[in-house]
Amino acid sequence: MTATDPVANLQTLIRCPSVTPAEGGALTALDAMLTPLGFTVDRVTAREEGTAAIENLYARLGRDGPHLMFAGHTDVVPVGDEAAWTHPPFAAEISNGELFGRGAVDMKGGIACFVAAVARHIEKSGPPAGSISFLVTGDEEGPAINGTIKLLQWAAERGERWDACLVGEPTNPDRLGDMIKIGRRGSLSGKITVHGVQGHAAYPHLADNPVRGLLQLTQALMDPPFDGGTDDFQPSNLEVTTVDVGNPATNVIPAKASASFNIRFNDSWTVETLRAEILRRLEAAAGNGQLRPGRPPAKYDIVWADRPSHVFLTRNNALIASLSSAIESVAGRSPALSTTGGTSDARFIKDYCPVVEFGLVGQTMHMVDERVAVADLETLTAIYQTFIDRWFAHAGS
């Protein structure tokens, strides 16, 4: 086996059961692919009290600029009901032109293809006129506390600087070449608790039902809309994700009621301005007597979740143009430049250099029978190799 073969690379990685937070041998396998290519490889274990220690990998080829980073993760989500899989989730079996296994598209496949692309570039042209690095974590599918964010800090403290980054997440909804992610919405979560007075459901005047107040508050968060979208982002959207009263009895008015929410927001907002708007809405709704006639304003508190994600947009023309033209040349289609979807580790990388995301088709990620077309692995490798050639030609000019 040589690192130029993306299929063999991916089979090796899938056969490592690296369900977060387990390394599972995946970083060891990646190390074994990169070291013979001339990369200097560091294994970095990150820790934080109350969380699982996570092993990460940073590898660099070359010492000069320009410097291109590829970022990704070898950790995967649990397999679910293994008996429901057509092929064992860590066997990496090929059937009818598809390679099955947990992580096939999210995102061991992207890593396997970029390794193959770099190996082919070296085989054809020698090392690049600059530097290529791999920044790979084992904590993307988990809490993301001991992963990319700490690996970036570790590398930056040692003098590492990057000119651009490609994240190999599965960005394509239907076909390879559909979409490049050039930014991501921000994400902010919180929990509202309304405090009432417990009592008998038949005597509501002797109690104060917090559910009524909670309904007022959550309604105010969902309507009216926060905005109508911007040129680069879809409208901000808030979803109530949990509702709880902790009350199993149908004839008891509960003492408190809580609801959690998450909002994905565009570049009309910052975390600070969005929090202020949410607090304004809650304060106004607390005094709304529609559901609580004759009652004083609802008593409530709000707790914000740690580590909100900030919205970002990449406008680096050289990075986007090099990748777009590579996709058009190899796949024959012009990719959409999108900011849709959830968050990724690009939210951390954007603080260090321009970053975009492009990988495989994501239709089966996290599903039973996660799989990738073998032909797509070859196509993605060719796209990545062409991108490497064009980015260094542009960045070095």
Curated annotation (Swiss-Prot):
Keyword set includes Transit peptide: no
Keyword Amino-acid biosynthesis attached: yes
Descriptive protein name: Succinyl-diaminopimelate desuccinylase
Family that this chain belongs to: Belongs to the peptidase M20A family. DapE subfamily.
GO BP annotations, alphabetical order: diaminopimelate biosynthetic process; L-arginine biosynthetic process; lysine biosynthetic process via diaminopimelate
Task of the protein: Catalyzes the hydrolysis of N-succinyl-L,L-diaminopimelic acid (SDAP), forming succinate and LL-2,6-diaminopimelate (DAP), an intermediate involved in the bacterial biosynthesis of lysine and meso-diaminopimelic acid, an essential component of bacterial cell walls.
Active site annotation, chain numbering: D75, E140
PROSITE patterns: ARGE_DAPE_CPG2_1, ARGE_DAPE_CPG2_2
EC category name: hydrolase
Pfam families: M20_dimer, Peptidase_M20
Positions contributing to Zn(2+) 1 binding: H73, D106, E169
Requisite cofactors: Zn(2+); Co(2+)
Matches recorded under InterPro entries: ArgE/DapE_CS, Bact_exopeptidase_dim_dom, DapE_proteobac, Peptidase_M20, Peptidase_M20_dimer, Peptidase_M20A
Coiled coil ranges: none
Enzyme Commission numbers on file: 3.5.1.18
Co-factor binding comment: Binds 2 Zn(2+) or Co(2+) ions per subunit.
This protein's pathway: Amino-acid biosynthesis; L-lysine biosynthesis via DAP pathway; LL-2,6-diaminopimelate from (S)-tetrahydrodipicolinate (succinylase route): step 3/3
Assembly description: Homodimer.
Alphabetized GO MF terms: acetylornithine deacetylase activity; cobalt ion binding; succinyl-diaminopimelate desuccinylase activity; zinc ion binding
Keywords: Amino-acid biosynthesis, Cobalt, Diaminopimelate biosynthesis, Hydrolase, Lysine biosynthesis, Metal-binding, Zinc
The reaction(s) this protein catalyses: N-succinyl-(2S,6S)-2,6-diaminopimelate + H2O = (2S,6S)-2,6-diaminopimelate + succinate
NCBIfam families: dapE_proteo, PRK13009.1
Residues that coordinate or bind Zn(2+) 2: D106, E141, H366
